[in-house]
């Protein structure tokens, strides 16, 4: 307790007793890594942490100095405790085996060490995203152990490094936010049982890619942009930060819908965001807060990955808007949204008046 308030350590211990303390101990190690990363991000240019390296990750993205430093921080904080069978990261081509000198556990930790790292040089909020799975037995993990649907996650969370550092966590019993008290060094429960409003009038998408979107996404965004004069009959606000953690955090606090949909900009990629360590943990957090998360055609947490760095379309946030966009995808796929062309009466649209939908 901190001045009568619940600390992260107390919270995870109380909520992970069934794991004999192993899951709680792992989460406390993750929190320690988050504190280290928070200090790194805060020092920024003072410590020479800004700028890029002469290396790329498995996605072909140029690595920032902070990408590598934060990745190493998580490995060092979490590899030694005996809870893990292995780790995987956006910044590593292959799964990371636990060093031989440390005991093995039955958990798998997958993470994006610094989401939105391109924003670090311009002092915009960035974050860390993580997901935890459980194996049936302790020992060294194999690649197949990681290729499981997000519905099998036992915990997921993110840290956001902004005006304050927060860690948002779910153990499958709701979504909860903890704020770092820098005086005591403790994470304190400040946002218990976060709930995402079912309706929203705010959407986040990179509109520079509009020409590459599929028709259902173009339809949805067009309706939102039309505002009161359009079929929705209401005005919408648009947001885009280019940091998934910052976007999702805003949605958890005040509602909204975040879209990084499938597009044709690079036909070889079914989506932009990585399924295992970006889409899955965020989907679990959003669903546990009463929201929804979809690829447009499937619940994100039901997608079975076939590779470690698989990408997926992501649409998540306020439930009614996510379901509307999923319906638009279904109507597009079945042809229900195609206009009817009459030889006598020109063209009639089969779109319903969405102001009454």
From Swiss-Prot:
EC number: 3.1.3.11
GO MF terms, alphabetically ordered: fructose 1,6-bisphosphate 1-phosphatase activity; magnesium ion binding
Residues where substrate binds: 115-118, 206
Cofactor(s) this protein cannot do without: Mg(2+)
GO biological process: fructose 1,6-bisphosphate metabolic process; fructose 6-phosphate metabolic process; fructose metabolic process; gluconeogenesis; sucrose biosynthetic process
Transmembrane region(s): none
Quaternary context: Homotetramer.
Protein name: Fructose-1,6-bisphosphatase class 1 2
Species in which this protein is naturally found: Dechloromonas aromatica (strain RCB)
Gene giving rise to this polypeptide: fbp2
């Amino acid at each position: 307790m901190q001045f009568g308030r619940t600390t992260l350590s107390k919270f995870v211990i109380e909520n992970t007793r069934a794991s004999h303390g192993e899951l709680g101990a792992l989460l406390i190690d993750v929190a320690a890594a988050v504190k280290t990363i928070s200090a790194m991000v805060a020092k920024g240019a003072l410590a020479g942490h800004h700028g890029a390296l002469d290396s790329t990750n498995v996605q072909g993205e140029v690595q920032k100095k902070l990408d590598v430093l934060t990745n190493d921080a998580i490995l060092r904080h979490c590899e030694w405790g005996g809870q893990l069978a292995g780790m995987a990261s956006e910044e590593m081509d292959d799964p990371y085996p636990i060093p031989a000198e440390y005991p093995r556990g039955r958990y798998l930790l997958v993470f994006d060490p610094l989401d939105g790292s391109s924003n670090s040089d311009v002092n915009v909020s960035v974050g860390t995203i993580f997901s935890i799975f459980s194996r049936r037995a302790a020992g060294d993990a194999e690649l197949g152990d990681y290729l499981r649907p997000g519905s099998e996650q036992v915990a997921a969370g993110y840290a956001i490094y902004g005006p304050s550092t927060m860690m948002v966590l779910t153990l499958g019993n709701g979504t909860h936010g903890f704020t770092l008290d820098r005086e005591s060094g403790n994470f304190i429960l400040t946002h218990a049982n976060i709930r995402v409003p079912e309706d929203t009038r705010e959407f986040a998408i990179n509109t520079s890619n509009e020409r590459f979107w599929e028709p259902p996404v173009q339809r949805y965004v067009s309706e939102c942009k039309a505002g009161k004069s359009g079929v929705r009959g209401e005005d919408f606000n648009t947001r885009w930060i280019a940091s998934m953690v910052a976007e999702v955090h805003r949605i958890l606090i005040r509602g909204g819908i975040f879209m990084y949909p499938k597009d044709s900009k690079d036909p070889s990629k079914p989506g932009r965001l990585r399924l295992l360590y970006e889409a899955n943990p965020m989907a679990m957090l959003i669903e546990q807060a009463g929201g929804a998360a979809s690829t447009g055609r499937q619940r994100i947490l039901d997608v079975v990955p076939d590779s470690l760095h698989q990408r997926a379309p992501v649409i998540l946030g306020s439930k009614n808007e996510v379901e509307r966009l999923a319906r638009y995808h279904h109507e597009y796929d079945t042809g229900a949204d195609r206009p009817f062309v009459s030889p006598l009466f020109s063209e009639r649209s089969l779109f319903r008046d969405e102001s009454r939908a």
